[in-house]
Every structure is written in C-alpha cells, then in structure tokens.
Amino acid sequence: MAKTPLEASYQASLLRRLRKAYRGRILATKTDPGMIQGIPDLIIISGPKYALLEVKRSATASKRPNQTYYIEKFGIESFTSFIYPENEKDVIYEMCDWFGLDFELFLKES
C-alpha cells in the first residue's frame, strides 16, 4: 500500500536528517515495503548494533498488520520503535543512547 504524502515526506526528512547528523557513524536506509509485510520502514546500523524504526505520520495513525509483531520481536536484542513527529525527539534520544551517539548532533539538523 502506498504511503500517504505526509508520511512519505516525513520519512524522507527523518532519514535525511539522520544521515546528515551522523555521517560516517551510521548506515541508515529504507526497507522495501513490498518484500515482507510489516517489517519496519527504516534500518539504522552503527557498529555491531542496529535499530528498526516504523515511521508513522502521527501518534494516531493506524498500524498495519504485523508492524507491532516485528517491533516487539526485534526489540528483544536491538532498538525498535514507532516514530512520528510527536515522539521524534524522545525516540531519537533513546536510539542515540542505544548506539552511544551524541543526541545534540541530531538536534542541530532539526
């Protein structure tokens, strides 16, 4: 299913800001939504650790089948979260803590 323009543009903006803030420190990429239904939208890798983020246009946006399953499944040994504009700073702060990255670098890009 195609993403709404709002979600797609938010996702692109988030990915761009992450890549710029942590250039050389992370690999951040989108997943292919057509491959496995429910796999989170973004994969961020830093050293031996990884994070999976499921991007939503808002806190009230509906979740698709299997999204919660994959967030919980991979969250056991990695960082996973739903992310939307209302919780962005909290999620990125926690992700930076997980990776050992400086959260202030992201704030400079926001």
Residue spans for each PLM region:
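Catalytic phosphate/metal-binding cores of nucleic-acid and nucleotide-processing enzymes, i.e., regions
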Residues: 1-110
